Amino acid sequence: MSPTTITLIFLAFAVVMFVTEKIPLAVTSMIVCIGLVITGVLNVNDAFSGFINSNVILFVAMFIVGGALFETGMANEIGSLVTKFAKSERGLIVAIMVIVGVMSGFLSNTGTAAVLIPVVIGIAAKSGYKRSRLLMPLVFAAAMGGNLSLIGAPGNMIAQSALAPLGLSFGFFEYAVVGLPILIAGILFYATIGFRILPNHDTEEDDSIFDETQDFGSVPKWKKVLSLVILIATLMGMIFEEQIGVKLCITGCVGALLLILTGVISEKDALKSIDLKTIFLFGGTLSLAKALEVTGAGELIADKVIGALGDHPSPVFFTLVVFLLCCVMTNFMSNTATTALMAPICLSIAQGMGADPRAVLMACVIGGSCAYVTPIGMPANTMVVGAGNYKFIDYAKSGLPLIVIATVISMIILPIAFPFYP
């Protein structure tokens, strides 16, 4: 059996297990990871490289930073402040989505989510609303906000790089032509109809540090202040990532280490704050994304779908197929891998049709950002699985309508703003 076929079998297995949850999500990920090694599709280094992926390192660091906010009670104090201004659950959801959406346009969407997840959990604790209803809008807003600027998401820069040899480019805010209407529509949706379909789970505290009932009266004031100062410093380091030349994950690690070294959080509590289910789920799933890439299975799927359109497909229909194909792929591969895979295919077909490559790539990028229906679609989705006590189906129920909204808006705006034959 060829490596491509084996990879597709593991993909099908993962989809079925993720949807049915007959076994835990993290266990499914590890079965796939180890299975790809046993079958010879990947070597050990490639299969387990996901566990030293920069996003996993960022997860670990920000779990500790978030844990410090909770251990000191600062997250609850921030929550109290926010709830004074947003009196209702709907108001909180709108406020969270607006703040996260705007921040994601200028800071990476993963970095934005990583910084604000502990804050939102604190808001949930003080407001009395279930965190499962606040965290999902947060990560969806992070994904939508990534399409407000050139630097909002890695896929945006990949598309820009693909255009460079052709002497073409996207403007800094050109993604917002499509991205901003989707963000606005998404916020309105979850403030109205979507409000009713958000998950409504009680959280499993276990021995997690994120204890909403803890008494913080004995915590020294300096610990609270220092935890907030380090959080803000970490955020600023992430915002100015390009200028200071330090990657997000390293900035997060510096913040986490400072919290431990200064005694704001103990080593024991720092380790307790790390959600291992999230780490195993994300790290293991990256092996599947790697296999789809190196075996050509992902390219095979794309080629078969695009090839079925024929030599001269309708521009609108072709745009729709590219958009939806990227939507599907990005929910099982990363946004970055999806755009990197699809960009050369789309460019080749666009040039063959004599179409504007920018039109096709914009559909590719926007579709590739619609990672709303699985917990593995983007790092932020995975980060909140444990905190929100989410199941796979929760993402599908809450995220699928958002994909429909994004598709409708894109198919209206793309032909007007980025015509195939300008």
Which ranges hold each PLM region?
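Helix N-cap/coil-helix junction residues
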Residues: K22-I23, V41, M74, Y129, ...
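Hydrophobic transmembrane alpha-helices of multi-pass small-molecule transporters
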Residues: M1-V60, I64, V177-D303, T319, ...
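Juxtamembrane and boundary regions of transmembrane helices in multi-pass small-molecule transporters
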Residues: I6, S127-F140, G146-I158, A162-Q214, ...
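Hydrophobic alpha-helical membrane segments of integral membrane proteins
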Residues: V27-V32, N109-I117, M136-P137, L148-G152, ...
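Membrane-embedded alpha-helical segments and adjacent helix-loop junctions characteristic
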Residues: I31-I34, I38-K130, S273-T278, F282-M353
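Alpha-helix N-cap/start motif
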Residues: V44, R131, F172, L248, ...
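Transmembrane alpha-helix interface/packing and boundary motifs in multi-pass membrane proteins
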Residues: A14-I23, I99-N109, F140-I151, G237-Q243, ...
